[in-house]
Amino acid sequence: MLHVIKTQDDPMIKFIKDDPVRPEIPADWRVSKNREVLTLVDENKNPLAMVCVAFCDSIPSSVEELLTDAIAPNTAIFYTIWSYAGGGGKSLIGEAQQYIKDTYDHITRFVTLSPTTELAKRFHTKNGAKVFRQNSDTVNYEYE
């Protein structure tokens, strides 16, 4: 089941501390305007995987660009994802895309802001993404 975190009052926000990719991004920014944290939870509401999403009007090549506010967002940027259970990340990336398609008709693209690691490359390409752009410190993978 998908749980959407939109405010700092959500008890699930405490799991942001486990983010292994972008721990420097504060929790309050992750749930501010045009931003959400999507969590795959089990029947007991325990997190299985988490992904942070920013709705942007361009594709950022760096964290600095990610932090700018969008005027007319049309792209979902998955900028960090982590899992507490095997297969959780794969399930979450698919459910997250479907939720966004069903909820935000103005969002037409799904792109990552990923580290330049083999782990990120394997995860995203195995789950159907293609390299959109190689940047100096990041890679953008695009999902169809």
At which residue positions do the language-model features occur?
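Short amphipathic alpha-helix that is part of the acyltransferase structural core
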Residues: 1-31
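Acidic-and-aromatic substrate-binding clefts and catalytic sites of carbohydrate-active enzymes
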Residues: 30-32, 86-87
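Short loop/turn microsegments at loop-to-beta-strand junctions
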Residues: 34-37
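Conserved beta-strand in the GNAT
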Residues: 39, 45-62, 77
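A structural signal for short, well-ordered beta-strand segments and their strand-loop junctions
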Residues: 39-40, 50, 110-112, 133
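Short beta-strand-to-coil "C-cap" segments at the C-terminal boundary of structured domains/repeats
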Residues: 54, 142-144
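Acyl-donor binding region in acyl/amide transferases
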Residues: 65-128
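Conserved catalytic-core motifs of GNAT/GCN5-like acyltransferases
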Residues: 130-142
